[in-house]
């Protein structure tokens, strides 16, 4: 789990969600694979399901495009899921989060 993913997971747990890491590492290809090619974390709580893609703030637009092009994206929305981007950045020496809901 990357540092940014760990930050998002900790934040969601603090907000009262149950959170699962849904990306995995393929040791043969030495690459990470997201759920449906676009989701890093899946959270449930407060009567909702939230799919989260975690990145740095500078890559938000690329990740937004990646999610919107994913075959599973329309079905996530039809299923009532919230799909959210977490873009982390440092301000001074404190981490800040920019959250974008799709």
Regions found by a protein language model. Name each.
Residues 1-102:
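Catalytic phosphate/metal-binding cores of nucleic-acid and nucleotide-processing enzymes, i.e., regions
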């Amino acid at each position: 789990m990357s540092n940014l993913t760990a930050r998002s997971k900790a934040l969601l747990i603090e907000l009262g969600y149950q959170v699962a890491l849904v990306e995995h590492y393929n040791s043969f290809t030495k690459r990470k694979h997201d759920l449906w090619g676009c989701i890093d974390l899946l959270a449930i709580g407060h009567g909702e399901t939230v799919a989260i893609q975690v990145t740095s703030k500078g890559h938000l637009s690329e990740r937004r495009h990646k999610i919107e092009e994913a075959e599973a994206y329309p079905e996530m929305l039809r299923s009532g899921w919230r799909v959210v981007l977490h873009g982390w950045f440092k301000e001074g020496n404190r981490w800040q989060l920019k959250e974008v809901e799709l």
